[in-house]
Amino acid sequence: MLSFLGKSVALLAALQATLSSASPLATEERSIEKRANGYANSVYFTNWGIYDRNFQPADLVASDVTHVIYSFMNLQADGTVVSGDTYADFEKHYADDSWNDVGTNAYGCAKQLFKVKKANRGLKVLLSIGGWTWSTNFPSAASTDANRKNFAKTAITFMKDWGFDGIDVDWEYPADATQASNMVLLLKEVRSQLDAYAAQYAPGYHFLLTIAAPAGKDNYSKLRLADLGQVLDYINLMAYDYAGSFSPLTGHDANLFANPSNPNATPFNTDSAVKDYIKGGVPANKIVLGMPIYGRSFQNTAGIGQTYNGVGGGGGGSTGSWEAGIWDYKALPKAGATIQYDSVAKGYYSYNAGTKELISFDTPDMINTKVAYLKSLGLGGSMFWEASADKKGADSLIGTSHRALGGLDTTQNLLSYPNSKYDNIRNGLN
């Protein structure tokens, strides 16, 4: 999900509400509308975060979060969804896990997230498939009816075995009209199989279906937005990665608006993407506004919208938290830097005049501004990439969003999975 804006990811909540229509889809749409009773405050949790970052499911501040999107599952060309890290996903034994359990049991993040769900009944967990690295096989997986059915079946198998509440598809990105059409068919198949599973094993429960969607026009202009708005519960708009090592000049990472007086600093902006999604047929209340919990750095620069030389990793004592040019929010601002605000673009950045390093990132004030913006347009809530990078306490971006949003969605998660392959999930960890 952390994508360069050639990728510009945007997850948007989308269920086209044509309430005047008497079609079965409109009826289903109305019932889904009633299920969410407040704003979404969603966060991506990465399975690789349990290693060097040492961020475990128990570290989530669950009271601030409505949806945890567990990333990522891989997929094969025939649509088969597979674990990309079996140890992290369901094998790792945590301190309170016994090595003497009888039967077949899930461990790893699957069990830990189920424990979080049990303790926080308003928190839903979704299984995310793809991402920037693992999107290669989506065109093939979506290209035939057989592959689409296989994708849906294998995705739902993991979902019910691990005790999750829905599926998130992160295809980066459909490249043409054919792929965009096949994406819709793929999502319709997943929706159909989710509903069939619910009818048999969880009557009355609605499993969620979401996507990550791009904020870059070159990518979202290819999508069938109105169709996505009908089949999905949420479209999470990845409204970040607007500038970085791929950019010719320094710029804002996640600005709300363009700045006509400094266009080099705002090659992209969130407002244009949001308005285009709505014009394209996505109901505003299904759009979830993505926000970054990281900053992008530029070195040897005089300021925003100007030339730079490097982003880190090439000397000068600056690299990044985990990769060159990308800093966890909890490491910012760096010592010696002062925070600047572009009041036109609505974007913050830090600048150190001595080292000539600029880092664009969201602050708590920026989150408050973005939440006010999304509320003004009737959007569905906030989404964050990703959980391990946040600060604790009053400066948490996720927590700031919760406080600014006010009433979060409290619809209950599901704890009953009678046909999970794992004894402990099937028994509700009892």
Swiss-Prot record:
Gene3D superfamilies: 3.10.50.10, Glycosidases. Its EC number is 3.2.1.14. The keyword Hydrolase applies. It is found in: Secreted. Chitin binds at G103, T104, G130, G131, W132, T133, Y173, M238, A239, Y240, D241, W385. It catalyses: Random endo-hydrolysis of N-acetyl-beta-D-glucosaminide (1->4)-beta-linkages in chitin and chitodextrins. Residues 1-22 form the signal peptide. Keywords: Carbohydrate metabolism, Chitin degradation, Chitin-binding, Cleavage on pair of basic residues, Glycoprotein, Glycosidase, Hydrolase, Polysaccharide degradation, Secreted, Signal, Zymogen. Residues 39-408 form the GH18 domain. Pfam families: Glyco_hydro_18 (PF00704). Its main location: secreted. CDD domains: GH18_chitinase. The keyword Manganese does not apply. The antagonistic activity of Trichoderma harzianum is used for the control of several soil borne plant pathogenic fungi. One of its GO terms (cellular component) is extracellular region. One of its GO terms (molecular function) is chitin binding. The active site is at E172. GO terms for biological process: chitin catabolic process; polysaccharide catabolic process. It comes from the Eukaryota. Belongs to the glycosyl hydrolase 18 family. Chitinase class V subfamily. This is Endochitinase 46. It comes from Trichoderma harzianum. The lineage of its organism: Eukaryota, Fungi, Dikarya, Ascomycota, Pezizomycotina. The gene is chit46.
